[in-house]
Amino acid sequence: MIYQMQMPAKIEVDEATHTDRFGRFVAQPLERGYGVTLGNVMRRALLASLPGTAITGLKIDGVFHEFSTINGVREDVPEIVLNLKKVRFRSNCKRNCKTSLVLNGQKEFTAGDIIAQEGEFEVLNKDLHIATVNEGATLKIDIFVGRGRGYLPSEENRPDGMPIGFIAIDAIFTPIRNVKFTVENTRVGQRTDYEKMILDVETDGSITPDDSISLAGKIINEHVTFFADFSPTEEEFTEEEFKQQDDEFENMRKLFNTKIEDLDLSVRSHNCLRLAEIDTIGDLVSRKEDELLNYKNFGKKSLTELKEQLEKFDLKFGMDITKYQMKG
């Protein structure tokens, strides 16, 4: 029997300070010590685990290293790099992309000039100053945009196959601008040693504070579930049962590794899945229905078609196939 611990009835929201970018959330009452425990784990998950979009590198015509100056441009390359790090995006696209710009002076280069060639992303802080191109000068620049989690330093951000003159930059993927928590005492009945945890979350606008704490909570839950489901005793199986389990396991693994192109799908559905980088049945069933509907050109007709295909294999969306994935 597990001792019943005091738990919050719900998360309270401070409506007076709540905006699309800032939220103050209160969890109470908590057992003593759990305010700091939950505050720390939520803060770490929010800062390091939420996916986001950022500029990962650039290439400027006529520039071969990051400490150069550019003829006809007021700012040098280090200044431009610092400004590009501040550009914030909203994007559901999971693949990396590149956009090319040609800017002729007299011209102020702002973040709003960075436009996705295929609508992969949207710049949020369009007025952010990047550089000034002087009259008669031209700035040709390729900007590489990618998806990731947390923060990736430039030293680890140099993919193979990049052109000569590619300059990797520190990628700040996290959509969280700031997060902090405080812990105060609170009363339950006659006891005053319970705790109240107050969590302040500020985002860059690509995600709401409500969605950010919900996603962080789900990520944490997925990790602690491993401990909750742990059992120190193992069931005894006969050799024949072990063999049957192994055969079923291998059959499922092969099924999840089956290429999407082997399914009888329409050209439209194939193209949507390819753009979303969904290559196998395993990739497909790992997605949830609402996640698929967020992809470009993916509608309910395509969703119905995919459902019918999965039902043939007794599969569905939102499956956890972690144990079937190859390790190492």
Swiss-Prot record:
Query: What SMART domains does UniProt report for this protein, alphabetically?
Result: RPOLD
What does the record give as the reaction this protein catalyses? RNA(n) + a ribonucleoside 5'-triphosphate = RNA(n+1) + diphosphate
Region of interest (Alpha C-terminal domain (alpha-CTD)), ranges: 252-328
Q: Which domain of life is it from?
A: Bacteria
Q: Which GO terms describe its cellular component?
A: cytoplasm; DNA-directed RNA polymerase complex
Keywords from the named record: DNA-directed RNA polymerase, Nucleotidyltransferase, Transcription, Transferase
Spell out the residue ranges making up region: Alpha N-terminal domain (alpha-NTD).
1-231
Protein EC: 2.7.7.6
Q: Which SUPFAM superfamilies match?
A: C-terminal domain of RNA polymerase alpha subunit (SSF47789), Insert subdomain of RNA polymerase alpha subunit (SSF56553), RBP11-like subunits of RNA polymerase (SSF55257)
Tell me the domain comment: The N-terminal domain is essential for RNAP assembly and basal transcription, whereas the C-terminal domain is involved in interaction with transcriptional regulators and with upstream promoter elements.
The role this protein plays is: DNA-dependent RNA polymerase catalyzes the transcription of DNA into RNA using the four ribonucleoside triphosphates as substrates.
Q: How does it assemble?
A: Homodimer. The RNAP catalytic core consists of 2 alpha, 1 beta, 1 beta' and 1 omega subunit. When a sigma factor is associated with the core the holoenzyme is formed, which can initiate transcription.
The similarity annotation says: Belongs to the RNA polymerase alpha chain family.
Name of the protein in question:
DNA-directed RNA polymerase subunit alpha
What species does this protein belong to? Chlorobium limicola (strain DSM 245 / NBRC 103803 / 6330)
